[in-house]
Amino acid sequence: MPTTLDQLNAMDRVGFAAALGGIYENTPWVAERAFTARPFASVADLYAAMQAAAASAAADEQLALIRAHPELATKVARASALTAESRREQGSLGLDRLSDADYERFERLNAAYRQRFGFPFIVCVRRHTRDSILDRFERRLASSPDEERAAALAEIGLIARLRLVDAVDGPGKPKTDGRLSTHVLDTVSGRPAAGLRVELAEIGAGTEGLL
């Protein structure tokens, strides 16, 4: 059951950090530092305070935050050695139910990435499909260490925003989705076409499915 913003505003530092400690994977100091900005008028204000705490942390603290996140779709993940939040997120894309061949592909990428950068590949899986994650994985291996450190922190912020929206009830939640509009022109009449059914499909590496 979500915690309300009013409840969070009434908590002491220990309770506040305990309630929000999982928003930034096993890193409760982010919530502890955001605590000083209470009371929060909106969930968006709370998120901004937590992001500010992470962004202003020392370099070694940020690296520890990055390293607190699990690798994607490893045999360790298969054995359920994940936080509840990460398990749900990876499970939503079936990353805990891959074939042995797919697990081996992820493990090769995980090993190559960790060897190059010294920390796990991080992506907000709830904003991706399995194919887009693999594509992003391959492309980011070519980045510089500084670029990947910045990318990892940005993805952590996206993960935290979605987790916070799920975990806290209150006014002014940060935006977590967007809009897609489709315009079909009737070229004979020069007016928008009416009565057409539009279906969106994702086409990936050997897969295709309606969205």
Residue ranges with predicted function:
Residues 16:
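Surface-exposed, charge/polar-rich loops and edge strands
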Residues 114-149:
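Long, amphipathic alpha-helical coupling/dimerization segments that relay conformational signals between
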Residues 205-211:
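Short, acidic Ser/Thr/Gly-rich low-complexity loop/linker segments typical of extracellular
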Residues 166-194, 200-203:
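Beta-strand-rich domain onsets/edges
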